[in-house]
Amino acid sequence: MHLPLTSHVSVLMSIQFSSDKEAADALARSYHALRQEIGKIIIGQDEVVRLVLTAVFSQGHCLLVGVPGLAKTLLIQTIADSLDLSFNRVQFTPDLMPSDIVGSETLTQQRDFQFVPGPIFANIVLADEINRTPPKTQAALLESMQEYAVTVAGKRYPLERPFFVLATQNPIEQEGTYPLPEAQLDRFMFNIELGYPSYEAELQIVKNTTSDTKPTVSKILHAAEIQAFQHLVRRVPVADNVVEYAVSLVHKTRPGTDRATARATQLLEWGAGPRASQHLIVGAKCNALLNGKYSPDIEDVKAVALPILRHRLVRNFKAEAEGITVEQIVKELL
């Protein structure tokens, strides 16, 4: 049973929609149109596209883990184009400084300082190979993700909204890298694993990318509409049993606590924190709306649970020695 949405109308919603129900229907239609447009260029990555769009409408950020050459840059560029948002890509290297990301003050001819914005000043930022840069530079990016603003020379500069960061990591080459600590990983809503395309998908990719024609995507939404839909997601009502399921799921991952499962205590060194519970509910709200429902159920929580918990659970030596993955542990908990 799905609860009806309230008739509350926000300032942004009142531009186009008479009620939240009408706005919810428009979001579902826009989502399917986005999937169609993105599918013209991005082939065989349907689950990745679903999760990235869910994060955008949930005001979350994504960590994308995959080997080079799987079209991570093309994916986020295509999504930015279809959403009519500005896009910047930052290649993280060991010598990258915080000022290279957030910007710096320069001396003008009038002998005063002028702030020159860095690449972080875009709606969508691709932080490529974030684990290749020192912690000081990582922290500058992660602060902007949390605060939606940067501070340079004591002055605070707000970032343009909507603001979304997609950071990538290469799981193979770990030499000379600076792994993100758990506290920093917790800033990301989703950890998405990007796998190789299927044989059929790769056939289509090769045909599409080796010809002289290049498909283009239509702009489906603009910034004001995206912000309106982000506020709509937050207003979706949730039944108590769904909230209880999400919080209970997170508590099951905390080894040695009253509500932890025996399996979690046996295999995990560390469990998920309260931010995971928050992301589960917001992600479930968004997943419900994108699929034409007006309130989430437990299945919507399950639909976003793995990418939310994947980077928040730390396996112990026993789990690593036995080759038990975080994915296996999460699926057992579900």
PLM region descriptions:
Residues 25-62, 67:
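Pre-Walker A (pre-P-loop) alpha-helix and adjacent loop at the N terminus of AAA/AAA+ ATPase modules
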Residues 96-123:
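Short glycine-rich substrate-engagement loop in P-loop NTPases that contacts/grips substrate
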Residues 13-18, 258-334:
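C-terminal engagement/docking regions of AAA+ P-loop ATPases
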Residues 20, 24, 41, 177, ...:
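Conserved C-terminal "switch" segment of AAA+ ATPases
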Residues 57-93:
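Walker A/P-loop
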Residues 122-146, 160, 175-184, 196-202:
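Conserved AAA+/SF3 P-loop NTPase catalytic/coupling segment centered on the Walker-B
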Residues 114-123, 152-169, 180-189:
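AAA+/SF3 P-loop NTPase mechanochemical coupling elements
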Residues 86-98, 154-158:
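Short beta-strand-centered segment that lines the nucleotide-binding/catalytic pocket of NTP-utilizing
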